[in-house]
UniProtKB/Swiss-Prot annotation:
<feature type="binding site">
    <location>
        <position position="191"/>
    </location>
    <ligand>
        <name>substrate</name>
    </ligand>
</feature>
<dbReference type="InterPro" id="IPR015878">
    <property type="entry name" value="Ado_hCys_hydrolase_NAD-bd"/>
</dbReference>
<dbReference type="GO" id="GO:0033353">
    <property type="term" value="P:S-adenosylmethionine cycle"/>
</dbReference>
<dbReference type="GO" id="GO:0005829">
    <property type="term" value="C:cytosol"/>
</dbReference>
<feature type="binding site">
    <location>
        <position position="351"/>
    </location>
    <ligand>
        <name>NAD(+)</name>
    </ligand>
</feature>
<feature type="binding site">
    <location>
        <begin position="304"/>
        <end position="306"/>
    </location>
    <ligand>
        <name>NAD(+)</name>
    </ligand>
</feature>
<feature type="binding site">
    <location>
        <position position="64"/>
    </location>
    <ligand>
        <name>substrate</name>
    </ligand>
</feature>
<feature type="binding site">
    <location>
        <position position="195"/>
    </location>
    <ligand>
        <name>substrate</name>
    </ligand>
</feature>
<dbReference type="Pfam" id="PF05221">
    <property type="entry name" value="AdoHcyase"/>
</dbReference>
<feature type="binding site">
    <location>
        <position position="248"/>
    </location>
    <ligand>
        <name>NAD(+)</name>
    </ligand>
</feature>
<protein>
    <recommendedName>
        <fullName>Adenosylhomocysteinase</fullName>
        <ecNumber>3.13.2.1</ecNumber>
    </recommendedName>
</protein>
<dbReference type="InterPro" id="IPR036291">
    <property type="entry name" value="NAD(P)-bd_dom_sf"/>
</dbReference>
<comment type="pathway">
    <text>Amino-acid biosynthesis; L-homocysteine biosynthesis; L-homocysteine from S-adenosyl-L-homocysteine: step 1/1.</text>
</comment>
<dbReference type="Pfam" id="PF00670">
    <property type="entry name" value="AdoHcyase_NAD"/>
</dbReference>
<dbReference type="InterPro" id="IPR000043">
    <property type="entry name" value="Adenosylhomocysteinase-like"/>
</dbReference>
<keyword id="KW-0520">NAD</keyword>
<feature type="binding site">
    <location>
        <position position="283"/>
    </location>
    <ligand>
        <name>NAD(+)</name>
    </ligand>
</feature>
Length: 429
C-alpha cells in the first residue's frame, strides 16, 4: 500500500534505537497506509509531479506509522527530507528503523531520549539547512530564530501541526521575529474537527487504559480544557461510563461544556472529586500544589496537551517522600501523609507515551494538510508575506471530498437555482 521499500546495504544517516526492528516497522507502516487513502492519492500524484525536487525539508513530528506515510509521500515528491521526533516519549522505534532501512529516510529519534538528545536532534534537523520545516510544537522554528538567524534566508516557509505551536508562532509574530510564512495546519477544518476531537479523545483514553488497565465506568474524570481536544476527551470518557467534570478559563467554552451536559467548576473544587485528571489546555501548571493537596489517595493525573508542563511535576517531586514505578508509564508519588498521586506517562503526551497516538484514519486528513501545505509554500515561494497563513479553503474542501469519496459517501451539490439565490441580495421575505 506504500511506495516500494528502498534496498540499501548502507543505511542513510540516522540515530535510531535498533535497525533490526525494521521488518516490524514496515508491516505497521503498510497497515496504517490502508487507513490513509487521501494521503495515498497525494503521494501518487507527488511521485509523478515531483513538486519538491531540489527542496530540503526537515520534519519534527511524532515518529509513528502515520508520520511515516507522510515522510514517504514527501520523499516520493522529490523532497530531500530528514525526520526528528517532536516529543521524547512518542517515537515508535520500529517505525524509525524501517524509515531508515526500508525507505532511505534519515531519522533521528529514539523513544525515551533525554532532553539533551532531543535538542541535539533539533540541531541536526537544522544542520540539514532546510527550505521547509514541518513543525509540531514549534521547537525547530524557535531554535532557528533564536540560534540560527544566518539560516533564515534558506527558508521558504514552515507548517505547524499543533495548537501549542500556533500559540508560539503568534507570539513570535507579535515580537517581530517570525520573518517567513507559516502555514497553520492546526486550524484547518479537516484537521481540528477530526484529529483534535476524535483522534485525541480516543487515543488519550487508549493511553490511560494501556498504562493502568483501569475500568473507566463509574470513575470521575476531570478534563481540564474544553477546546477541540478537551471536547473529544470528555465525550469519549462519558461514552465509557465515566462521570465527567470540565474545568475552563474561557466563559464561552464553559457554557458549551454545561450545555453539552458536563459539570463545570474550578480545578480547586474538582480536585477532591476526581479519580482521573486529564489536562488538554496547552498551558502551564494547570494542576499544581494546591490541587495535589486536596486530591484523593490514588488520584491519577495525565496530560494530553503538548508539553510536560501542564502538571507541575517539579513541585510534586519536592512534595513526595518517595517515587516508584508501579507499571510501565505509571509512577506513584507518595506524599508524607501517606497519600499517593499516580502520574501517567511522565506527564508527557499520554496518548503517545503509553499508546500509539491518533488512529491513522484521522491522521490521513491532518497529514494531507501537511503535504499540501508544503506544496502550497513551494508553489507560492516569495509571494507569501511573513506571518501565519491558513490552509487555503479550496485545499481543505478537496481533502474532505477525497475522504468522503474514500469512505464511499456521496453528498448533495447546489442546484443552479440555489447558487443564484446564495449569490443574490434581492430576494427577501
Amino acid at each position: 500500500m506504500v511506495s516500494s521499500p528502498i534496498k540499501s546495504e548502507a543505511p542513510v544517516r540516522h540515530d535510531v534505537k535498533d535497525l533490526s526492528l525494521a521488518p516490524l516497522g514496515q508491516q505497521r507502516i503498510e497497515w496504517a497506509s490502508r487507513e490513509m487513502p487521501v494521503l495515498r492519492q497525494i503521494r501518487d500524484r507527488f511521485e509523478k509531479e515531483k513538486p519538491f525536487a531540489g527542496i530540503r525539508l526537515a520534519a519534527c513530528c511524532h515518529v509513528t506509522t502515520e508520520t511515516a506515510n507522510l515522510a514517504i509521500a514527501l520523499k516520493a515528491g522529490g523532497a530531500d527530507a530528514v525526520l526528528i521526533a517532536s516529543n521524547p516519549l512518542s517515537t515508535q522505534d520500529d517505525v524509525a528503523a524501517s524509515l531508515v532501512v526500508n525507505y532511505g529516510i534519515p531519522v533521528f529519534a529514539q523513544k525515551g531520549e533525554d532532553t539533551a538528545t532531543y535538542m541535539r536532534h533539533v540541531n541536526i534537523a537544522l544542520d540539514h539547512r532546510p527550505n521547509i520545516i514541518i513543525d509540531d510544537g514549534c521547537d525547530v522554528v524557535a531554535t532557528l530564530v533564536k540560534e540560527r538567524q544566518h539560516q533564515i534566508s534558506d527558508i521558504i516557509g514552515t507548517t505547524e501541526e499543533t495548537t501549542t505551536g500556533i500559540v508560539r508562532l503568534k507570539a513570535m509574530f507579535r515580537d517581530g521575529v517570525l520573518t517567513f510564512p507559516a502555514i497553520n495546519v492546526n486550524d484547518a477544518d479537516t484537521k481540528h474537527f477530526f484529529d483534535n476531537r476524535y483522534g485525541t479523545g480516543q487515543s488519550t483514553l487508549d493511553g490511560i487504559i494501556r498504562a493502568t488497565n483501569i475500568l473507566l465506568a463509574g470513575k470521575t474524570v476531570v478534563v481540564a480544557g474544553y477546546g477541540w481536544c478537551g471536547k473529544g476527551t470528555a465525550l469519549r470518557a462519558r461514552g465509557m461510563g465515566a462521570n465527567v467534570i470540565v474545568t475552563e478559563i474561557d466563559p464561552v467554552r464553559a457554557i458549551e461544556a454545561v450545555m453539552d451536559g458536563f459539570r463545570v467548576m474550578p480545578m480547586l473544587d474538582a480536585a477532591p472529586l476526581g479519580d482521573i485528571f486529564i489536562t488538554v489546555t496547552g498551558n502551564k501548571h494547570v494542576i499544581r500544589a494546591e490541587h495535589f493537596a486536596v486530591m484523593k489517595d490514588g488520584a491519577m493525573v495525565a496530560n494530553s496537551g503538548h508539553f510536560d508542563i501542564e502538571i507541575d511535576l517539579a513541585t510534586l517531586k519536592t512534595l513526595a517522600k518517595q517515587v516508584r514505578v508501579v507499571r510501565n508509564f505509571t509512577e506513584e508519588y507518595i506524599l508524607p501523609s501517606g497519600k499517593s498521586i499516580i502520574v501517567l506517562g511522565e506527564g508527557r503526551l499520554i496518548n503517545l507515551a503509553a499508546a500509539e497516538g491518533h488512529p491513522a484514519s484521522v491522521m490521513d486528513m491532518s497529514f494531507a494538510n501537511q503535504a499540501l501545505g508544503c506544496e502550497y509554500l513551494v508553489k507560492n515561494k516569495g509571494q507569501l508575506a511573513a506571518g501565519i497563513h491558513p490552509i487555503p479553503a479550496a485545499v481543505d474542501q478537496e481533502i474532505a471530498r477525497l475522504k468522503l469519496q474514500a469512505m464511499g459517501i456521496a453528498i448533495d451539490t447546489l442546484t443552479p437555482e440555489q447558487v443564484e439565490y446564495m449569490n443574490s441580495w434581492t430576494s427577501g421575505t
